[in-house]
Amino acid sequence: MLYAILFLLCALAAAWAVVALAHWHWLLGVPVFVLVFALMHAVYVLIWWLLTLPVDRSKPLEKQNPRAREACRGVGRFLCLYGGLRPHISGEEKLPTDSRFLFVCNHRSMFDPLMVIGYLYKWNISFISKPSNMAIPLAGDIAYNAGYLPIDRENDRAALKTILTAADYMKRDLCSIGIYPEGTRTKDGELLPFHSGSFKTAQRAKVPIAVACVRGTEKVKRRLLLRPTDVYLDILELIPAERVCAMSTAELAEYSRKRIEEGLKA
């Protein structure tokens, strides 16, 4: 609701700018719209950050903050809109509505998690992300309150702690968890090797794994607002919890990678 109001206010501001600058050139209204939209969204994020305080990152969350979750959704939708994404999502019916799950997907662009956050809001998926993302002022605190976790792959002990915390969140029905097993974005479109350790999260929590693939987000950076970009997120399969616990993490990584590889070729 608040996000809809924000968009309406920005649209009205842009319309006013077009009228005010009409004696110069109507195209001047375009950068004004973008600037006003960005500034108002910054105010939106600041307000939600104030509403989610205080935050103590040294301890796991006892309860997810719904205002922080809504703020993440707003940011995700805004950036997808700003980037000109035209999302096409299939296979949502495969995602469970009665249990938490581990969301596993390939990684092509910064827009990958934003699309999930903005458009799969119903399933309450929080991501394990690199520490630099969680260190962003204001945004990092909001993300932490929404259940997002940093993982330092260079520090095995810290990485294990994150995996155990993520499993605990799912056990306590706080949120589902999303990971990108490649560990980083692919630069040439080819699927990178999967880190098997992250699959321990699902085994510890005894939850199913939703395997998905994303296509087209790597094109967004080249286009931005010039023209919309069709992007595709396909939910390929839900691996039942019983099967997850019966397989090794290496087998889960190999199987998930194979399914994603097949999905990208389809």
How would you name each of these model-derived features?
Residues 160-266:
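Non-catalytic C-terminal accessory region of glycerolipid acyltransferases
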Residues 52-74, 81-82, 96-155:
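Catalytic core of membrane glycerolipid acyltransferases/transacylases, capturing the structured
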Residues 89-90, 149-152, 241:
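Short acidic-hydrophobic, aromatic-tinged amphipathic segments that line or gate anion-handling sites
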Residues 75, 87-91, 113-114, 163-166, ...:
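A generic local structural motif
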Residues 89, 103, 127, 233-235:
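Generic preference for hydrophobic
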Residues 1-14, 18, 22-100:
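Membrane-anchoring hydrophobic helices of lipid-metabolizing enzymes
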Residues 82-84, 122, 143-145, 172, ...:
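Short, well-ordered coil/turn elements that cap or connect secondary structure elements
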